[in-house]
């Protein structure tokens, strides 16, 4: 049995090739000599800005109250209490998605008990950070709003009152996640393409089995690490709750596991048998080439239902999270990249597919119908729907749509709506309105556009309809009075809140500034006599 080593008494051996100095090094002489009035005392420890004081972190009563909340959910109660006390907030609004509303009353009780501030729960539906309702909170008399479950999509410098975003990071079984990836996805690129991508395709919207989940003996055997093949290239994404878990997964996958070590030898009837850990059997032990993509201003690895990064040179993407809404965003933006989903609650891996042909066909028909209605002035005008659910509505996007319409077209009708539904829009007469352009969320048009009796376009699709941009691959539009066809190219973009979006029909479009040309100074010639 190996004897443990006491690090405090370990002796460092001389490093080969490096000679130890035989005498102390001579200190360099000071160029300037002066007197110092500084006292020889311990260095001053400065507290980081917004760091929670110890009296809040170690408050026994507060920690006992926090213990009533799920331990793997980080609601950042200490930080919230600190900000309320520091700014002497008397009333605070709490906003969270429906999945977290069950904890809202407990959080409100804790805030009221330990700060004295009056908590107000905003119970309107909250789909994302774009729904932060600082306007309503301020009108209700709140001095601060705490928004749970989403990232800082709307900067705190733009909100009308003090704003605190709480991501609600959720702790998951990261070792299980890492081993699940290694058990199902070969670290060898050629083996991955043969065993995983060769598993076949499923019906649109369905799932296909992962090859290594079969009962074949070759799939259950310990993978051979003797190959010098290139590593499998994986892209890791998730919602904001699991971004920390994806970063930990990246660190695990980028480091090769050590070779299997034989355990204790036991004597059995058939001979000597070496025991190994059960979890080490059938695990690919090589390292992977991992990418955590970013679509700024989102965090690295974070995806929204409307915003996802483009992927380059990856063999597959792995999404950590429950449901498909956010995953579908990056699948739409990257139709050729195989997608897999790890559900941290059920701890299951599934391969996910998306019917890009059907989606593009439906959206193409809506764009064509809207363009036809625009050319036919007798069919009614376009209506622009400005979303009023939180911060979904963008005046910049509204102005972009209005300016993109042809000068000879009917002026658009402006409508303000918090939530859209086919029944509500059906109340508006067909003779006056032919097409709806909604600015709330592109996924309303992509996922539910077929349910409306008239075209319901996103700002990007409206820009395609008026000819500002070509559109996606497979889309062919009549070029109006100029004749001919406008052929689309590329993929359907999912960049609604990205800084580097395609155009100003998105809220945060920030075109790259042209760099000023550098003028090289002229060489001065020597004067001749």
Curated annotation (Swiss-Prot):
Cofactor detail note: Binds 1 [4Fe-4S] cluster per subunit. The cluster is coordinated with 3 cysteines and an exchangeable S-adenosyl-L-methionine.
Family: Belongs to the DPH1/DPH2 family. DPH1 subfamily.
An annotated GO cellular component: 2-(3-amino-3-carboxypropyl)histidine synthase complex
NCBIfam families for this protein: diphth2_R
Pathway the protein contributes to: Protein modification; peptidyl-diphthamide biosynthesis
InterPro entries attached to this UniProt entry: DPH1/DPH2, DPH1/DPH2_1, DPH1/DPH2_2, DPH1/DPH2_3, DPH1/DPH2_euk_archaea
Entry-linked Pfam families: Diphthamide_syn
Binding site for [4Fe-4S] cluster: 130, 306, 441
Keyword match Iron: yes
GO aspect biological process, one term: protein histidyl modification to diphthamide
Natural source organism: Cryptococcus neoformans var. neoformans serotype D (strain JEC21 / ATCC MYA-565)
Protein name stated in the entry: 2-(3-amino-3-carboxypropyl)histidine synthase subunit 1
